[in-house]
Amino acid sequence: MIKIKRLNLDSSWYIKFNKLNFVLDPWLIGSEIDGFKWLNEQWHIKPPVPIDDIPNYDSIVISQNYEDHCHIETLKRLPNDKSILATEKAYNKLKKQFPNREIIRIDTKNEMEKNKINFISIKPPKIMDPIYFALLIYDQDNNGIFYAPHGFTLDENQKELVNKFKIKLMITTFTEFKLPKIMGGYVNPGMSNVYELYNQISPKYIINTHDEKKKAKGLVSLLAKIKYPDLESIENIKDFNFINIDNYKSITLN
């Protein structure tokens, strides 16, 4: 059983997966800055769920090292006794920022287990930034969640790994967000990648993420070419099983 709730309209979530309750990529206060304000600063259009209103949770999961996923000011406000599970680059950042907190690395080769839920990090074949990870989260019955907030291109080994599991839910961006190549090129690859992933891993349900039309200023917002999805049209695609969550209500998936 999966219970899921948006914590903002971008890419922060509360998820209950069987007996594990976790908060994913929380950015719940203030703006997010990528390096410098002159480069990129963004704000939510709709206020996120207040921190005190988050349902009870066991852990915090961080998928990327970038501020809109690994938001330090939000993490400072969350209880210190909550363990933080993080992919490689986020782990390194968080260990420096919070030396006294329990921070656990989600590896690419050996699964990390928490309350009988396993996590594996899926990394693209890149050594230069931007590097965007995906997460495979699964239970003892091989039911899984595939989370790729910036989309993902699976190689053959990664596709073989993911296909060992029954993916109940795929959470990925539907937005196409492109910068000049020197600044990273495609940040979010858009619907073509959504369809590619859908055909590769056959999820039962699909939910979009990281698609908020945020207020932004700086060089990135001047140079970015953005194509937001038409969610109503996507809802009408036959046999696609897309669930449009545009509010802060919880839904349960069986």
Where in the sequence are the language-model features?
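Active-site environment of divalent metal-dependent phosphoester hydrolases
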Residues: 9-11, 29-31, 65-70, 91-94, ...
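Structural motif
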Residues: 20-22, 58-59, 83, 143-145, ...
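Pre-active-site segment of Zn-dependent metallo-hydrolases
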Residues: 20-61, 73-74, 153-165
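Cap/insert and terminal regions of metallo-dependent hydrolase folds
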Residues: 89, 155-250
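Extreme N-terminal starter segment of soluble prokaryotic enzymes
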Residues: 1-4
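Metallo-beta-lactamase
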Residues: 86-142, 241-254
